[in-house]
Amino acid sequence: MKKIGALVLALSLTLSLTACGQKAEQTAAQEEPESGEAEPVELVVFAAASMTETLTEIADLYQDAAPNVTLTFNFGSSGTLLTQIEEGAECDLFISAASTQMNALDGTLAQDAEKNPDGLDMLVPGSRIDLLENKVTLAVPEGNPKGIESFDQLAQLLADGSVFLAMGNSDVPVGQYTQKIFAYYGLDEAALAESGVLTYGSDVKEVTTQVSEAAVDCGVIYATDAFSAGLTVVDSATPEMCGQVIYPAAVIRGGNEEAAQAFLDYLQTDEAMAVFESVGFSPAF
């Protein structure tokens, strides 16, 4: 009788342990993500203000390609974005409106005190590319009240003190391109500013707004911003006047490097490039 009781007890324990094991396996299976489902990723992208409309549209498209990725954008002047990155702001991918700001983070230029004065090495090796090309344009408010037709005419009007021009600050790429145009025409920016014919914007969007609101007679902005704002472009600067307008992009060290590279690769696809080209960008790679 004792043997039978012991046998029943052993059988009960075996069944109990089996049931517990099955329950644990079911719980573990429920906790595991479905096969092929990628882990959620938040990707922080710092990009020039002139890319606001295009990258916002591309972000919606990218959801289909990478539904696990949440894109967070920080748009602003490239100079401001550079400063934020240098000060330790979280950033996975940087897209600048000029090479100057990207050079300041490029470790391959660490020995070049002019291009990388602080000797920083913050870019993932091999990730830097020239992504896009833009154009510097002369845009006017609706109706073109001042009758401005070209950069040649603008130079004369500035010299005469008979025009009011909006341009970017000196730490903003669009402002730096404008300074090159001044140099091309032999104009003294300091003298022009003192005479009251210039007003400044902290980024290209601010300059564009001044033109859109007819607060100025004209403004020097990118072709893409003029298109997005529905402004009339009366002239475009040649490379001889201000050089090429190249937008470099690179993955920043220490963040979500793999996901950032994947998004940068996507920006070079036909689907993404169609969005860029629709507003006036062209591929630079």
Show the residue positions of the predicted features.
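Positively charged n-region of N-terminal signal peptides that target proteins for export
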Residues: 1-10
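C-terminal motif of bacterial Sec signal peptides marking the signal peptidase cleavage site
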Residues: 15-19
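Exported/periplasmic ABC-transporter solute-binding proteins
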Residues: 21-60, 64, 79, 98-99, ...
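A generic structural motif
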Residues: 66-73
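Ligand-binding clamshell of periplasmic/extracellular solute-binding protein-like
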Residues: 75-83, 90-110
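Active-site charged/polar residues at nucleotide-handling catalytic sites that mediate phosphoryl
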Residues: 88-89, 214
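Ligand-binding "clamshell"
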Residues: 105-127, 226-237
